[in-house]
Amino acid sequence: MKNTFILGIEGTAWNLSAAIVTETEIIAEVTETYKPEVGGIHPREAAQHHAKYAASVIKRLLAEAKEKGVEPSDLDGIAFSQGPGLGPCLRTIATAARMLSLSLDIPLIGVNHCIAHIEIGIWRTPARDPVVLYVSGANSQVISFMEGRYRVFGETLDIGLGNALDKFARRAGLPHPGGPKIEACAKDAKRYIPLPYVIKGMDLSFSGLSTASSEALKKASLEDVCYSYQETAFAMVVEVAERALAHTGKNEVLLAGGVGANTRLREMLNEMCEARGAKFYVPEKRFMGDNGTMIAYTGLLMYKSGNTLTLEDSRVNPNFRTDDVNVTWIKEEEMKKVPEISPEAFLRAPPGERLDNGAEAVIYLDEGPEGKKVLVKERVPKLYRHKEIDERIRRERNRTEARLISEARRAGVPTPIIYDIEEFKLKMQFIEGVPIKYLITPELSEKVGELVGRLHSSGIVHGDLTTSNLLLAGERLYLIDFGLAYFDKSLEARGVDVHVLFQTFESTHRGHETLVKAFEKGYGSTFIDSKDVLKRVEEIKKRARYA
C-alpha cells in the first residue's frame, strides 16, 4: 500500500516550522524561530520573520526529503495552521500553503492548531482516549473527545498559562522565553509565598496570580516568587485535570502544549495520576512546543478522512476554537467505553466503604445516630500540591462548604444537612440519590435551572456546577459540593457559574443543546435577572484566548 505524504506548515506565533510525514514516519522537519530583541512577541514582526524565511524553510525541507527518496511529486496534500493564532502570522503561512497547493496541484488542509497538539501526543504515546491538559502560550484547556468533537471541559477565563508566565518574567526582568527561566530560578528557592489560587469549577484564571506575583517581588526574592508562582499555577491546572478525570471516569491524561515541557508540571501530573490509578502520557519535548510535524500529521488524518479545503474556504481564523472542529477521523465506536457506576452501588455500600474518589475528597459512609447511615466527606492531602497550598485550600473549602450548604438550604435549595465539622472532614446527611450525570434529561435540566435560579437569587454562586454535583433522590433534586461556593451578586460571577454547567453539558452529555434550552427555561422561572446572566454567559464563551 502506498504511503500518504503530507507537508505541514506551522506558524501561529514564534515558530515557523514545516515537516513532511507519513502514517508512521517523520520524513523531515525544518524550523526557524522568531526571537525579538526585547520584550514579548510582536505580531507584525513575527509575520515579517515568517515571510522572510518561508521560502528557505520549504526549500530546505524538500531537499532533506529528497535525500530520503521523497520528491515533491510524492506529496498528497499541504496542511497549514488555520488557527487559532496571531492573525498576521496565520495569513503569512496560509499564503505559502496556498502557493504550494496550487503549484503542486494537490489538496489544501486547514488544521486547528490546538487539535494538532493533541493528535501529535496521541500519535507519539500509547494514549487512546485521554483527558488532555493543553497548556501553551495563549491556551489553557482541559479537553476530551465525545460525539465527533474534542470537547472543552474547562479553560482559562483570561490569559493562557504560557503568556501569564512570560508576562511575569518580563516584569521580573527575565529574558524570553520566560517559562524556562522561571523554572530554573524556582530550583534555588528557599520558601513558599502564599499567592491567589483561582479555580471556578473546571475553569481557571491566571491574571490575578501574575499581578500578585509581580507585587511579591517587592518583598521576596526572585527565586522564592518564581517557585511560588509555579507551585500555585501548576497545582491549579492539575486540579482541573483531576476534576475532569473524576467527572468522566476516564483513566488517561495526556499533557500537550509548550508549557508541558516544564519538569515540575510533569512531576505533579504524574503524582496525581498515580494517586488515582490513571495513566499519564507526555510526548517527547520536541513535540511539546509548536512544530510542523503536528500540523503535517493532523493534516494527514484529515486528508485520509476526506477533510480538505478549497482555496475559497482557506481563510484563517485567529479565534478558531478546539470544539468548533468536526473530527471526521475518529470513529466513536473505537473509543474506550467509560464504565458507569451502578446507581444502586450508592445505596448498598456498607459503612466505611469508599463511594467516590473525587478531585477534592473521598466519600464514604459511617454509622450515625440510631444506626442511620451518615455520609463522610474527607478532604485528603493531595501530594502533588505544596503542603502550604494544600492545607490552606482543604481547610478553607471545608469551612466554606459547611457554611454555604446551610445558607443555600435556607434559601430554598435542597442540600444535605451538616451534622459535624472537623478541620478537613464533614459528616452530613446521606442522600439516597444518584448523580444526574447518569440520568440527565431535558426535564431534569429544567429542574436544575430552577434550583440554580433560587441559589443565585439568594446571592450564592456555587462555583462548581457540574452534573456530578447534583443528586436525584426520588422526585427531589439536591445540590451538593459547595467547596468552591461564595457570595457574589455580579453578572460575571453568575455567568461563570452557568458557563461551567453549560461546558459540562457540551463536553459530557449528548444532545447538549436541548439540555441548555431546558435549563434556561427553568432558570428564567426562578431568577428575575436570568436574561442578563445568560447574555453574559454568551460573552464569556466568545472571549478570545489570543490577545
UniProtKB/Swiss-Prot annotation:
- In its keyword annotation, does this UniProt entry include tRNA processing? yes
A GO cellular component annotation here is: cytoplasm
Question: Where are the catalytic residues?
Answer: D464 (proton acceptor)
Location of the Protein kinase domain: 340-547
Query: What detail does the entry give on cofactor binding?
Result: Binds 1 Fe(2+) ion per subunit.
Cited InterPro entries:
ATPase_NBD, Bud32, Gcp-like_dom, KAE1/TsaD, Kae1_archaea_euk, Kinase-like_dom_sf, Prot_kinase_dom, RIO_dom
Q: Which family is this sequence assigned to? A: In the N-terminal section; belongs to the KAE1 / TsaD family. In the C-terminal section; belongs to the protein kinase superfamily. Tyr protein kinase family. BUD32 subfamily.
Q: How does it assemble?
A: Component of the KEOPS complex that consists of Kae1, Bud32, Cgi121 and Pcc1; the whole complex dimerizes.
Q: What is this protein called?
A: Probable bifunctional tRNA threonylcarbamoyladenosine biosynthesis protein
Q: Source species, please?
A: Methanosarcina acetivorans (strain ATCC 35395 / DSM 2834 / JCM 12185 / C2A)
